[in-house]
A protein has these predicted regions:
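Acidic, divalent-metal-binding catalytic cores of TOPRIM
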Residues: 1-180
Length: 180
């Protein structure tokens, strides 16, 4: 990307995957050297930004074909799905650390793993696979309310004030041509 002779702002938006914070910082540093505006989501993937109980409830209430859905029922189900997926986060972070630290001793690797896991699970809604979350939630909504659900279904039901700051800020910067 350093061959950008046209002086056109180049933007790349990426999921963090299960990369460590150190790896992500290094990628951002490399991107700046190459004149690439790189933004790595703070959440696991873009779908995680659509995990909003109010927007999910609005969509579900409007489109359900059977049953009665309420905020307490939906909130409980969302927490169940998140809890189900937390184990995947632990496994995938550990796998990534092992793959990238073959020469690091086991004690250091375990400490790094625990630090990354604590950081990610500070808010499990952010760390889980958003795609898998909506897949599991959709299985439940189809069975109980005869409606599929996905991030794309939910996003139009966000109120302006519900749009996550990170998303709104990034869109604003790109639209105005600012560097990230």
């Amino acid at each position: 990307f350093s061959c950008n002779n046209m002086k056109v702002a180049l933007y790349c938006i990426s999921n963090p995957g299960y990369h460590t914070r150190g790896e992500i910082k290094e990628r951002i540093r490399e991107a700046k050297v190459g004149s690439l505006n790189l933004h790595v989501w703070q959440k696991h993937e873009i779908d995680n930004y659509a995990i909003n109980v109010d927007a999910i409830l609005k969509y579900s209430t409007q489109h359900k074909r059977k049953g009665k859905i309420s905020l307490p029922i939906l909130t409980k189900k969302i927490e169940e799905v998140v809890n189900t997926l937390e184990g995947d986060v632990l496994e995938n972070i550990s796998r990534e650390l092992i793959a990238n630290s073959a020469n690091v001793n086991a004690i250091h690797n375990m400490a790094l793993s625990n630090e990354e896991i604590d950081h990610r699970l500070n808010n499990p809604h952010d760390a889980i696979s958003g795609k898998k979350f909506f897949e599991l939630l959709s299985n439940w909504t189809q069975e109980n309310y005869e409606i599929p659900i996905s991030a794309l279904h939910v996003i139009p039901y966000f109120e302006r004030h519900e749009v996550p700051n990170e998303v709104a800020s990034l869109i604003s910067k790109i639209m105005s041509g600012e560097n990230l």
